[in-house]
Amino acid sequence: MRSRIAQYGAFTRDRLYEYLPDQEPREYLYDLVAAYPQRSSSMLRPSLLIASARAFGAQASDALNTAVAIELMHNAMLVHDDIEDISELRRGAPSLHRRAGVPLAVNAGDALGFLCFQPLLDNVATLGPFLTLKILEEALETMFQAVEGQAWEL
């Protein structure tokens, strides 16, 4: 099972890189946007999503865009959480706000959050509009639950 989870994580990471913009302003935005996704991580959330989809009879490729969206949003929340908690490190390297300052880190975190919507919308091509909207509804509900939980923690 571990090898399968690792495979799903690698599958997700490869697709995620396709959604990271390679354009200007690199130094002040897009290099920062890519910083957390490029760091080593377990990719547990997207891997479990793909494994769950497979358990219900879907192909891994059917769940891939949603897995990418989850990982992008997770990284966005990590950027903001590190600022809120004044964390020095993330995944063995300086946290983004320590590396680039709070304003640029907030902006990069926002961009990561916005980027998550494109793979969700790209689901229309493979899953159709009805299922895509259901997934989007669930994703939005989960995002709100996460920020509400963070509000309680703060």
Segments (PLM) and residue ranges:
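N-terminal amphipathic/basic leader segments beginning at the initiator methionine
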Residues: 1-20
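Mg2+-dependent prenyl diphosphate-binding active-site environment of isoprenoid biosynthetic enzymes
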Residues: 23-154
